[in-house]
UniProtKB/Swiss-Prot annotation:
Underlying gene: CNRIP1
Protein name as annotated: CB1 cannabinoid receptor-interacting protein 1
Disulfide bond positions: none
Family statement: Belongs to the CNRIP family.
Any Gene Ontology CC annotation: plasma membrane
Biological role stated in the UniProt entry: Suppresses cannabinoid receptor CNR1-mediated tonic inhibition of voltage-gated calcium channels.
Alphabetized GO MF terms: type 1 cannabinoid receptor binding
Assembly with partners or alone: Interacts with the cannabinoid receptor CNR1 (via C-terminus). Does not interact with cannabinoid receptor CNR2.
């Protein structure tokens, strides 16, 4: 096992397919478990792009609400600062969220040698008939995380989460 990095920076981007369209979130205040709700459309595919620093880290998949998304190594960024993985998250068969409710979904990414990244997203899934609701709110390009691996190499503590 290699040295344990002091900090891990990772970003997760979601883009609705086939047109690489933006994903939106809305600020709900304290009405629900979290103050931000990510809006997703059922029966759709989303391109997932994960960028990681340091570039020595390896990951094979991300689990989004129990759906395992295999990640493929795409590249290192031109400046060599971060490594980039991509995959496709499919919401086919996901039930729409009931009106006035939100769904907490667990996000996990097991890293080789340093432990698992875990967080929760608050999501509302809309069906095709309410697809316009998916575009109300603020678009985001990426969710950035600053994490610290723990000494047992089992989990990473999330120090900071930012919607950009």
């Amino acid at each position: 096992m290699g040295d344990l990095p002091g900090l891990v920076r990772l970003s997760i981007a979601l883009r609705i397919q086939p047109n690489d369209g933006p994903v939106f979130y809305k600020v709900d205040g304290q009405r629900f478990g979290q103050n931000r709700t990510i809006k997703l459309l059922t029966g759709s595919s989303y391109k997932v792009e994960v960028k990681i620093k340091p570039t020595t880290l390896q990951v094979e998949n991300i689990s989004i609400g129990g759906v395992v998304v295999p990640l493929e190594l795409k590249s290192k960024e031109p400046d060599g600062d971060r490594i980039v993985y991509t995959g496709t998250y499919d919401t086919e068969g996901v039930a729409p969220t009931k009106s006035g409710e939100r769904q907490p979904i667990q996000i996990t990414m097991p890293f080789t040698d340093i432990g698992t990244f875990e967080t929760m997203w608050q999501v509302k899934f809309y069906n095709y008939h309410k697809r316009d609701h998916c575009q109300w709110g603020s678009p985001f390009s990426v969710i950035e995380y600053e994490c610290k691996p723990n000494e047992t190499r089992s989990l990473m503590w999330v120090n900071k989460e930012s919607f950009l």
